[in-house]
């Protein structure tokens, strides 16, 4: 087999066999296929695409290229949840304890964040003492004893994906649907869960800017999951507006805790009920309607908060921070003022996320330091009435030299109009093996 022939085959729009894809991924991971040939192949995929069988073969080959987590030591059906990311997306901190409170095991390995704010692991490390690196035996033991553990993921999962993503990043081949789908799903399959729930964001703060793109990605990933023997469901959700009331790290953890107590914002609460409900459905706990009711009940009866509390305590976190949210670190606050009277008509969510990163809440490079106290509180969101000079957001930072630029960027990222805009739904659709159901 020669890499030249596989590049030529894909250039002509022909489908590769699973054997050819396995050979290519193994060879590239081992350093036997040079970057320039893999880059040529990736560009051919951008122009000619891949069908579901090819994408599944590529996903499985990448999953097998590194360590595959064996979760058989954890009792019950394990459901993994993945979000394609956005601004204010603290859903794992809420939906995972909700699902665990309803009796399903949640063994979740999450990443650190590159970009707007920290990932789930960075957010959890805002709680002093919380251990995100656990030996496998302890991770399993905690899940078997209390039903949930959230830790950092091994760098050894889907080794080929890491290498291929770095190449895509510098060769303008990031935005290919089969390459995006195989990258996400290779890590999910390597993480060892029995079923997978995907939260595919659509909008100005999402990787997929419109619903049609998001639906195509969701359908492809569900197809891969099902072909790989994992029951898979995707929700297509709105990221034209930041989720919840905050973007940052400690500030998002505090908001997640309030939500677990039943005191959170309506959009975050509603989305987490749907995410936890679908996790329960995938774990075969009942009909979807019953599972959604169970998820909602875990917030009203306090069991979801108790489950989060148990997990933090068990993993060495200081639970006094959960009992008294004012303990979380804070930074000096600076308001962003409305430039005129009217209604907040639109938010450029990606630019708002970039503003949070400018304040110190995110990182551009792996080694960058995140300030847990930095972030943004959204006082007004799309559809809200505003008065000139009224604060529409609060910026929190220890970098006073960045404030003026951050205020200017935030003001430039929102549009105020005379007419109140129509409110877009939070959830657009649910995608399963049976097809797309509008929500």
Q: Over which residues does each language-model region extend?
A:
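Short glycine/serine/threonine-rich phosphate/pyrophosphate-binding segments
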Residues: 87-95, 100-101, 108-109, 115-118, ...
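Alpha-helix C-terminal capping segments
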Residues: 47, 93-107, 187-192, 227-228, ...
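Well-ordered secondary-structure scaffolds
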Residues: 5, 10, 15-18, 28, ...
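N-terminal glycine-rich anion-binding loops that anchor highly charged ligand groups
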Residues: 1, 10-73
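Active-site cofactor/substrate anionic-group-binding motifs, chiefly glycine-
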Residues: 49-110, 114
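A glycine-rich helix N-cap at a beta->alpha junction
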Residues: 123-149, 219-225, 229
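Active-site-proximal beta-alpha loop/turn segments in soluble metabolic enzymes
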Residues: 42-45, 123, 161-170, 199-208, ...
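Phosphate/diphosphate-binding glycine-rich loops and adjacent basic-rich segments that engage nucleotide
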Residues: 144-193
């Amino acid at each position: 087999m020669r890499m030249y022939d596989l590049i030529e085959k894909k250039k002509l729009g022909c489908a590769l066999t699973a054997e050819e894809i396995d050979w290519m991924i193994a060879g590239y991971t081992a350093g036997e296929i040079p970057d320039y040939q893999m880059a040529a192949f990736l560009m051919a995929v951008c122009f000619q695409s891949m069908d579901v069988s090819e994408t599944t073969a590529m996903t499985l080959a990448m999953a097998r290229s590194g360590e595959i987590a064996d979760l058989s030591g954890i009792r019950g059906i394990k459901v993994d949840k993945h979000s394609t990311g956005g601004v204010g997306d603290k859903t794992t901190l809420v939906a995972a304890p909700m699902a665990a409170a309803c009796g399903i095991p949640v063994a979740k390995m999450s990443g650190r964040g590159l970009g707007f704010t920290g990932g789930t692991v960075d957010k959890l490390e805002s709680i002093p003492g919380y251990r995100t690196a656990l030996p496998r035996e302890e991770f399993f033991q905690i899940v078997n004893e209390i039903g949930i553990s959230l830790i950092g993921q091994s760098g050894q999962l889907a080794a080929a994906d890491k290498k291929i993503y770095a190449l895509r990043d510098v060769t303008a081949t990031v935005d290919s649907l089969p390459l995006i789908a195989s990258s996400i799903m290779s890590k999910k399959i390597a993480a060892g869960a029995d079923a997978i729930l995907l939260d595919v964001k659509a909008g100005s703060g999402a990787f997929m800017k419109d619903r049609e793109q998001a639906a195509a990605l969701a359908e492809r990933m569900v197809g891969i999951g099902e072909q790989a023997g994992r029951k898979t469901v995707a929700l297509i959700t709105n990221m034209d507006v930041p989720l919840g009331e905050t973007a940052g790290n400690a500030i998002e953890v505090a908001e997640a805790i309030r939500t677990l107590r039943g005191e959170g914002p309506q959009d975050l609460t509603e989305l987490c009920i749907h995410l936890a409900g679908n996790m329960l459905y995938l774990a075969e706990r009942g009909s979807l309607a019953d599972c959604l009711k169970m998820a909602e009940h875990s917030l009203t009866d306090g069991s979801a908060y108790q489950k989060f509390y148990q997990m933090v305590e068990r993993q060495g976190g200081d639970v006094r921070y959960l009992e008294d949210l004012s303990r979380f670190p804070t930074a000096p606050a600076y308001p962003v003022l409305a430039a005129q009277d009217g209604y907040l008509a639109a938010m450029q969510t990606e630019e708002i996320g970039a503003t949070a990163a400018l304040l110190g809440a995110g990182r551009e490079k792996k080694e960058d330091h995140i300030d847990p106290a930095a972030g943004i509180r959204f006082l007004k969101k799309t559809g809200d009435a505003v008065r000139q000079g009224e604060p529409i957001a609060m910026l929190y930072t220890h970098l006073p030299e960045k404030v003026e630029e951050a205020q200017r960027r935030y003001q430039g990222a929102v549009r105020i109009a005379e007419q109140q805009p129509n409110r877009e739904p939070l959830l657009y659709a649910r995608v399963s093996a049976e097809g797309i159901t509008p929500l």
